[in-house]
From Swiss-Prot:
Catalytic site positions: H191 (proton donor/acceptor)
Organism whose genome encodes this protein: Arabidopsis thaliana (Mouse-ear cress)
Misc: HDA5, a tandem duplication of HDA18, is not required for the cellular patterning in the root epidermis.
Function: Responsible for the deacetylation of lysine residues on the N-terminal part of the core histones (H2A, H2B, H3 and H4). Histone deacetylation gives a tag for epigenetic repression and plays an important role in transcriptional regulation, cell cycle progression and developmental events. Histone deacetylases act via the formation of large multiprotein complexes. Required for appropriate cellular patterning in the root epidermis. Involved in the differentiation of hair and non-hair cells in the root epidermis. Is not directly involved in the regulation of the expression of pattern genes.
Upper taxonomic lineage: Eukaryota, Viridiplantae, Streptophyta, Embryophyta, Tracheophyta
GO BP term, pick one: chromatin remodeling
Official protein name in the record: Histone deacetylase 18
């Protein structure tokens, strides 16, 4: 079967037994270029005003924010999902002059309450906390527990911007402020599930936008949303979030390889059609192998997606625009061209009044990514009718998959059942067009194209003749100029000699300059070496000085501690001395009191001695001045003259005086000792 993609964007089935013979006689160079060209190229564009050279254009919104490039691998290792993905797209659009004709919007951060419409609170908090976990090791630990995820300090902000930007564009399109839009965002989102990040995806951007329109903006009257996912990988996260929701029709065409292609398992199988109210509203078209191209995708569009979309009648279309099915993608292994993407998008724009929002998902070949994105934006702008041609067949596995999907879903979508007979077209290439008239019309179209090209060639011939006349006139001018040149040859010869001498002088000057430069470099090297030595010496001196100061400080601290210890000893000794002084004062006071008591007793004894017998009277002054050692014993004669009874009182008095005197002497010595000790201490 031969699939021909014509300017009308229709998929036409051509009988290879007839048309190949004709088409091979006509070189494809006679057909228009497959890439879309802008009618306004070379004309001045008004930036973001939606008008080109006075012609009204669709209002196309573009979101790009360089902040999303901060999301990168923490160790600088190159990954396929890299910041250059969105940079390449933006540069491609700028070079083509497309950004000036669109409404350029900055990024917008998503609100937590909108994210929690499809994600759990725990997951939202985890992504938010990534930026606060300052150590990469902690982020790496979190990433290691997830599937195909890397994180750095900018990941959280980029994820919030990606989700919020898709919400922003979708809201403006639903409001009618924009006709359509393309959110050039990263990280992608269709793998992210309600409670888990995976497959490069942190938040499910498209799912957040769809839930926002349905639940947060009922005033926009968006009741049915079609989510188309043409990324080469199955959008497992989006499928699970709307598994039971009949308001959202999810259509995903992807590589499945019987469950062995990422994200693996049976989630992407065509039997996964939804559950409960959402049964029949989840459509998976799983490729059995790689190598699928434009013909395969457009066959799916014509035989499954377009009929179902006509029945569903969406109010808005959200497109998970992954370009990893493009030619040369390192992960996809398929070969969709920019032309193929543009035709698929053009067909979708026939629904929902053209209200369609593209959100970037995958795509890891930078060249294919840029070209495919540009082709899609040009379709959004409705630059020009799509031109192109491709002589390719859908794979046999594509026919099997389309038939299996239609049989599985025909109970939910009558249009698939009603057109089952047309499925035979996939088996019989000439079923749609088996008449000679159709072939003749095609040949006539090709002839008209060739006639137009012949007209262009004739115009070129006329231009060449005019240029030949100009060349003849120029030749005459050149001959006149040649004569002038010959006249100046002599002057030039002299100048050559002078130039040679100047060149020689210049060479000598250059050699001298090189020599001087070499000497300067040597001087700089020596100066640098001297500088390094000086700095080393200074640093050594500073270090030694610091060490000496530290040693001196230690000595001072030791001395200070020693002085503090001595001071403590002095204070202790002073306390002891004060205590001893107090004790001595107490003893002195006691001795004085004792002396006073003794003196009182002596006075009493003296008074008794004066009145005892009345025979002798001794004055107090005599007693105080008397030295008992000078008392001589009574003379024998005196003893003989007195009776023993008369003598007895005198003897008693003498003994008492001797005893009191000795006691007084002892007390005085004690008082003197106390006084001397006190004087010594003071």
């Amino acid at each position: 079967m031969l699939l021909k993609f014509e300017a009308s964007s229709e998929l036409r089935l051509v009988d290879p037994s007839v048309s190949l013979t004709v088409l091979r006689k006509i070189r494809l160079s006679h057909l228009p270029d497959m890439t879309m060209t802008s009618e306004s190229s070379g004309k001045k564009c008004g930036e973001g005003d939606g008008k080109v050279a006075g012609k009204s254009q669709r209002k196309v919104g573009l979101v790009y924010d360089e902040t999303m490039c901060k999301h990168d691998t923490p160790n600088g290792k190159v990954d396929v999902e890299c910041p250059d993905r969105i940079r390449v797209i933006w540069e491609k659009l700028q070079l083509a002059g497309v950004t000036q004709r669109c409404v350029v919007l900055g990024g917008s951060k998503a609100e937590d309450k909108h994210l929690k419409l499809v994600h759990t609170k725990k997951h939202v908090n985890l992504v938010k906390s990534i930026s606060t976990k300052k150590k990469d090791s902690r982020r790496n630990k979190i990433a290691s527990q997830l599937d195909s995820i890397y994180l750095n300090g900018g990941s959280s902000e980029a994820a919030y911007l990606a989700a919020g930007s898709v919400v922003k564009v979708a809201e403006k399109v639903a409001e009618g402020e924009l006709d359509c839009g393309f959110a050039i965002v990263r990280p992608p989102g269709h793998h992210a599930e309600s409670d888990e990040a995976m497959g490069f995806c942190l938040f499910n951007n498209v799912a957040v936008a769809a839930s926002f329109l349905l639940n947060e903006r009922p005033d926009l009257d968006v009741k049915k949303i079609l989510i188309v996912d043409w990324d080469i990988h199955h959008g497992n996260g989006t499928q699970k979030m709307f598994w039971k929701d009949s308001r959202v029709l999810i259509f995903s065409v992807h590589r499945h390889d019987h469950g062995s292609f990422y994200p693996f398992g049976d989630d992407g199988d065509f039997n996964m059609v939804g559950e409960g109210p959402g049964e029949g509203f989840n459509i998976n078209v799983p490729w059995e192998q790689g190598g699928c191209g434009d013909a395969d995708y457009l066959a799916v569009w014509n035989h499954i997606l377009i009929p179902v979309t006509k029945e569903f009648k969406p109010d808005i279309i959200l497109l998970s625009a992954g370009f990893d099915a493009a030619i040369g993608d390192p992960l996809g292994g398929c070969c969709v061209t920019p032309y193929g993407y543009s035709v698929m998008l053009k067909k979708l724009m026939e629904f929902a009044h053209g209200k369609i929002v593209l959100a970037l998902e995958g795509g890891y070949n930078l060249e294919s990514l840029g070209k495919s994105s540009l082709a899609c934006v040009q379709v959004l702008l409705e630059d020009k009718q799509i031109h192109g041609s491709s002589e390719t067949y859908p794979l046999e596995s594509t026919r099997r998959v389309i038939q299996a999907v239609r049989e599985r879903l025909c109970t939910y979508w009558p249009s698939l059942d009603a057109s089952m007979a047309s499925n035979e077209n996939l088996k019989n290439p000439s079923a749609e067009r088996n008449s000679a008239d159709a072939l003749l019309r095609e040949v006539e179209e090709l002839k008209s194209l060739m006639a137009a090209r012949d007209g262009e060639l004739e115009a070129r011939r006329k231009e060449l003749k005019a240029k030949n006349k100009e060349l003849e006139a120029n030749e005459k001018e050149l001959e006149a100029g040649l004569m002038l040149i010959r006249a100046r040859e002599d002057v030039i010869c002299g100048l050559h000699a002078k130039i040679e001498s100047l060149q020689q002088e210049r060479d000598e000057a250059v050699a001298k300059a090189e020599r001087i430069d070499k000497e300067l470099q040597e001087d700089r090297a020596r100066s640098q070496e001297f500088k390094e030595d000086t700095e080393f010496c200074l640093s050594t001196l500073r270090r030694e000085k610091e060490l000496a100061i530290m040693a001196k400080n230690k000595d001072l601290e030791a001395k200070e501690k020693e002085l503090e210890a001595r001071l403590m000893l002095v204070h202790a000794r002073e306390d002891k001395i004060h205590a001893k002084i107090e004790r001595l004062q107490q003893e002195r006071d006691e001795a004085v009191a004792k002396a006073e008591r003794i003196d009182k007793e002596l006075q009493e004894d003296r008074s008794r001695s004066r009145v005892g017998n009345g025979s002798f009277a001794f004055s107090q002054e005599f007693y105080e001045d008397m030295d008992l050692d000078e008392l001589e014993p009574l003379s024998p004669e005196f003893n003989e003259d007195m009776d023993s009874e008369e003598l007895e009182p005198f003897q008693v008095i003498k003994k008492n005086m001797e005893r009191s005197h000795k006691k007084f002497i002892k007390d005085m010595e004690c008082i003197k000792f106390i006084a001397s000790e006190r004087a010594r201490v003071l």
